[in-house]
Amino acid sequence: MPARCVAAHCGNTTKSGKSLFRFPKDRAVRLLWDRFVRGCRADWYGGNDRSVICSDHFAPACFDVSSVIQKNLRFSQRLRLVAGAVPTLHRVPAPAPKRGEEGDQAGRLDTRGELQAARHSEAAPGPVSCTRPRAGKQAAASQITCENELVQTQPHADNPSNTVTSVPTHCEEGPVHKSTQISLKRPRHRSVGIQAKVKAFGKRLCNATTQTEELWSRTSSLFDIYSSDSETDTDWDIKSEQSDLSYMAVQVKEETC
């Protein structure tokens, strides 16, 4: 059987995660512990070597600092008391509810249930009633839809026959939704034609054949003049002139092309 705290209104064990301390061997300190327990327990006559008190009844100054640090760091699960530590903290019992208070609580619960039922009934949708448009909106067209609904109830175990009940006709009146139509036709248009005049720029061509013929006629005349003479220095001059004329003819052809 695990050891339990002997203090009044307490019963912590090591399974509760509390540190348990046995009564000290010092007689003077043990008397102080007995006085503490007897303060809330009239049937307490004195503790023995197996009597324990849990750590909930000691002030923080009664614990060794190193043991507190070790427990916070989870190195150890048990606290240690300093020499001469005496329990001073009593656990206050939870007050038991009185009979009058029990009746008041039951009445409060009933009133809360009634209020919730009333809220649900208010939130439930009721039959839609006919609403008339305002004076300012009487000119607008209104749409009235009246529907007759028949509700058929399912047969119960006691009454196998099907019962059909008619629901009174309800009218719904509301403003007509107006729609706007926009014409997206393409407007008339006129196309204007533009005519551009293009001038043809040609090249002036020269007749190269006539020029070459004139050059060859000049060379032939020179050959006729000097044909009777022997080949002298003048012959070399004529040949050079012929080469110059042929070169000029080639240049004329290149310019015309």
From Swiss-Prot:
UniProt-listed Pfam families: THAP
Key words of the record: DNA-binding, Metal-binding, Zinc, Zinc-finger
One term of GO molecular function: sequence-specific DNA binding
Keyword Zinc-finger attached: yes
InterPro entries xrefs: THAP1/10, THAP_Znf, THAP_Znf_sf
UniProt keyword annotation of DNA-binding present: yes
Residue segments, region Disordered: 154-178
PROSITE patterns: ZF_THAP
ZnF (THAP-type) ranges: 1-90
Comp. bias intervals (Polar residues): 154-168
Protein name: THAP domain-containing protein 10
